[in-house]
Amino acid sequence: MIEVLTTDSQKLLHQLNTLLEQESRCQPKVCGLKLIESAHDNGLRMTARLRDFEVKDLLSLTQFFGFDTETFSLAVNLLDRFLSKMKVQAKHLGCVGLSCFYLAVKSIEEERNVPLATDLIRISQYRFTVSDLMRMEKIVLEKVCWKVKATTAFQFLQLYYSLIRETLPFERRNDLNFERLEAQLKACHCRIIFSKAKPSVLALAIIALEIQALKYVELTEGVECIQKHSKISGRDLTFWQELVSKCLTEYSSNKCSKPNGQKLKWIVSGRTARQLKHSYYRITHLPTIPETMG
């Protein structure tokens, strides 16, 4: 049980309590997301399809620069918070998305790894200017009430993973693959429907689904303890698990278009490459979700 875990687990539990307390703040408005989902695609209005394409582009940029999943998760949070409040025209989505991404990068990444705005725009292949980006950044900040930091599903995923791992014998602590869980969360972020889930519920749904596949009783007990502590109903968990399962099945199929950093490769000229740090133009393909070891 969580109540009798190790000292390290108690520290993790304290962090979890803090996240749970803050969770409801700085989240997208569900009613606004539903409006986007119901919008018809006429080339002018914001739609779920356009939003999802934009998030895939942000994921490509995240991989291109080698940024953390936490940065991507925060960028998606900022984007959805803004889109759920504002009526954004399709032609402005690229500028909005890149502004949210840049805010997340400056908030999470080390200063030495933050690219110049000019480089970010060039590599993203957009035609707007740095001034346009800065103006949009200010608008985004105003609409999110200058609250860039937010509780994300990635933070819950990290904590839940660490808590469950603490309950395992040392020799079995690598049974649950965090890289695989991260890849699954990234795939879910690329679907607007998952932004309607509470971050804690989405994170636990991803882990619970993975643990079901592992068929490891001790891990299942850990999930049940966390579910109870986080006050997540069985109905909610099952609902989102089913949606996650469907998403990952589609993501693994050839029908799903995946983010691709390759399209960014050609835009980096020799001159630009010399000006950028090595990590800036190191392309990493979006990995397929690692197979479960068994």
UniProtKB/Swiss-Prot annotation:
Q: Name one GO biological process term.
A: mitotic G2 DNA damage checkpoint signaling
Keyword Nucleus recorded = yes
Coiled coil ranges: none
Keywords for the protein's UniProt record, in alphabetical order: Cell cycle, Cell division, Cyclin, Mitosis, Nucleus
Gene Ontology molecular functions: cyclin-dependent protein serine/threonine kinase regulator activity
Induction of its expression: By doxorubicin (DOX).
The record ties this protein, via CDD domains, to: CYCLIN_CCNG1 (cd20583)
Query: Single GO cellular component annotation?
Result: cytoplasm
Q: What is the first-listed, main subcellular location in coarse terms? A: nucleus
Compartment list: Nucleus
The source's domain of life comes to Eukaryota
Q: Which InterPro entries match?
A: Cyclin (IPR039361), Cyclin-like_dom (IPR013763), Cyclin-like_sf (IPR036915), Cyclin_N (IPR006671)
What Pfam families does the record point to? Cyclin_N
The entry assigns this protein to a family as follows: Belongs to the cyclin family. Cyclin G subfamily.
What does the UniProt function comment say about this protein? May play a role in growth regulation. Is associated with G2/M phase arrest in response to DNA damage. May be an intermediate by which p53 mediates its role as an inhibitor of cellular proliferation.
Q: What is this protein called?
A: Cyclin-G1
Species, as recorded: Rattus norvegicus (Rat)
